[in-house]
Swiss-Prot record:
Record-level GO BP terms: DNA recombination; DNA repair
Gene Ontology cellular-component annotations: cytoplasm; Holliday junction resolvase complex
Protein name per its UniProtKB record: Crossover junction endodeoxyribonuclease RuvC
Known catalytic reactions: Endonucleolytic cleavage at a junction such as a reciprocal single-stranded crossover between two homologous DNA duplexes (Holliday junction)
Organism (species): Corynebacterium jeikeium (strain K411)
Enzyme class: hydrolase
Keyword set includes Transmembrane helix: no
Catalytic residue positions: 4, 65, 138
Complexes and interactors: Homodimer which binds Holliday junction (HJ) DNA. The HJ becomes 2-fold symmetrical on binding to RuvC with unstacked arms; it has a different conformation from HJ DNA in complex with RuvA. In the full resolvosome a probable DNA-RuvA(4)-RuvB(12)-RuvC(2) complex forms which resolves the HJ.
Family according to the record: Belongs to the RuvC family.
UniProt entry tagged with the keyword DNA repair: yes
């Protein structure tokens, strides 16, 4: 399961890893919360939505975008609050969470750690064989996180085993 955390829009996706680098899309969506709603209610709505996804798809692992510093402190705080709620939902179900920075995801998917949103959307559409690009960008980002983890998990497992 790939999650692009956000309080206004949170991208959610589920993919199935195949042999080699084959990855198959299962579901993608976005949870929206109104900005005029109190933060605690928005977080509760996000928690309930991700819980429903856990019920519906029973993912074995979550790939979550790591919060990084942006110029807007309020945005960073809201994203961090959302990430905490999402990690809590996974932890309550015993689902491991793996975090990736935006540049790690971009490098994995496009080969360029500085790829723009349009390039990332084109790449994830092509990689997953989608007939149209996922919208909004939060949905594409959630898929990219899931694919990134599918591709990196075997290597991460080997590295951990040897250290």
């Amino acid at each position: 399961m790939g999650i692009d955390p956000g309080l206004t829009r949170c991208g959610l996706s589920v993919v199935q890893a195949g042999k080699g680098r084959a990855v198959y899309p299962v579901a993608v969506g976005v949870v929206r919360t109104p900005s005029d709603m109190p933060v605690e209610q928005r977080l509760n709505k996000l928690f309930d939505a991700v819980e429903q996804w856990f019920d519906d798809y029973q993912p074995h692992v979550v790939a979550l975008e790591r919060v990084f510093e942006r110029s807007n402190v309020s945005t960073v705080m809201n994203t961090a609050h959302a990430s905490g709620v999402l990690m809590l939902a996974a932890a309550r179900r015993g689902v491991d969470v793996h975090m990736y920075t935006p540049s790690e995801v971009k490098k994995s998917i496009s080969g360029n750690g500085r790829a723009d949103k349009a390039q990332m959307t084109r790449m994830i559409t092509r990689i997953l064989g989608l007939s149209e690009a996922p919208k909004p960008p939060d949905a594409a980002d959630a898929l990219a996180l899931a694919v990134c983890h599918c591709w990196r998990a075997p290597l991460n497992h080997l590295v951990k085993g040897k250290l």
